[in-house]
Amino acid sequence: MSAETKKTDVKKVVLAYSGGLDTSAIIPWLKETYDNCEIVAFCADVGQGSEELEGLHEKAIASGASECYIVDLKEELVADYIYPTIATGAIYEGTYLLGTSMARPIIAKAQVEVARKVGADAVCHGCTGKGNDQVRFEGCFAALAPDLKVIAPWREWEMVSREDLLDYLAERNIETTASATKIYSRDANAWHISHEGGELEDPWNEPTQGVWTMTVAPEDAPNTPEYVALELEQGKITKVNGEALSPYKALMLLNDLAGAHGVGRIDITENRLVGMKSRGCYETPGGTVMFAALRAIEELVLDKTSREWREQVGAQMAHLVYDGRWFTPLCESLLGASKPLADLVNGEVVIKLYKGQASAVKKRSPNSLYSEEFATFGEDDVYNQKDAEGFIRLYSLSSRIRALHGHNK
């Protein structure tokens, strides 16, 4: 944003606010830089934990905001963003269940809604200029509200460290509980928590136990496995151990159960959208169980070509979500096309939790294509094995013709 624009065009800004060091400094910085504009703080409750939200309204006002909106998005996040995404089979680079990525579209959408409500002419985020989130947020803003100005302080101000931010707040007598000794950058929601920075920036360093917060170390997990019974309807878990739960509450319970057995840890070096590689340690205990349960029922109900197609859709969807392209026609098309397959995912699964693993050990579905009568290795009355001969001749016909014409030499 140009210097001329700063003084004249920005009157009211809605800031994506967490109460952390960065956004606490952004509030006074915005007022100083943008001609004493009004700042409205917005916080999305996506299941990051009540301790993260405690005292947030008071803290925002004390930092200079005129108001602070805390919007509960937990159920919507799980029902309308997480479930549709995992129904496509989306996993980024084979391991990452897209915990941070899936939360960004709903946060950006809610931020735009608050901006419309209060009559703001700009939105602001605290994402760094090196990360993926700046692209995700601003891509969503462009799709939903291209008329709103976007302010990204980390691409404008001269502060480069936590010490700089602490000094900035101290000079303005703004209190903060943050310190310069924070080791890791963390981002949490109902689905997962990410850990980056500190000694993790060297991929030769093994994560210490101090990194992990949602899961116990697998080697310290109980020596006795735990079995969790799940019921699924149209690709969503509706009951856990016989108890009917909302999507969000089911996920929270599974987080507790799986986390106690060390399930859901990954340590990866991923390709960021902005071109560099980054190392992240992620914990997704409940999500790992949910993903395993859905895949178990899919094995029963999806035919071969449907599963192959779904794998292609999942790969494409993973990149769309990771790259911040949720509000696009292609994303909408993939989600819509995947729904008929998700609607077949009905049944029951028993998941075994043990020493970091979540394994589906029992599964059944009213939509199952599996038939024990046809699949048995014993004697049966429903399958004539001689029928396979004609199938094999036709299946291998092109290979036979190629060989007869001498093209295999």
UniProtKB/Swiss-Prot annotation:
EC number annotated for this UniProt entry: 6.3.4.5
Chain positions recorded as L-citrulline binding sites: Y96, S101, N132, R136, S185, S194, E270, Y282
Catalytic activity: L-citrulline + L-aspartate + ATP = 2-(N(omega)-L-arginino)succinate + AMP + diphosphate + H(+)
InterPro entries in the cross-refs: Arginosuc_syn_C, Arginosuc_syn_N, Arginosuc_synth, Arginosuc_synth_CS, Arginosuc_synth_type_1_subfam, AS_cat/multimer_dom_body, Rossmann-like_a/b/a_fold
Subcellular location: Cytoplasm
Pathway: Amino-acid biosynthesis; L-arginine biosynthesis; L-arginine from L-ornithine and carbamoyl phosphate: step 2/3
Binding site for L-aspartate: T128, N132, D133
GO molecular function terms listed in the Swiss-Prot or TrEMBL record: argininosuccinate synthase activity; ATP binding
Residues in the signal sequence: none
Pfam families (UniProt xref): Arginosuc_syn_C (PF20979), Arginosuc_synth (PF00764)
Record flagged with keyword Translocase: no
Name of the protein in question: Argininosuccinate synthase
Native source organism of the sequence: Shewanella piezotolerans (strain WP3 / JCM 13877)
Gene that produces this protein: argG
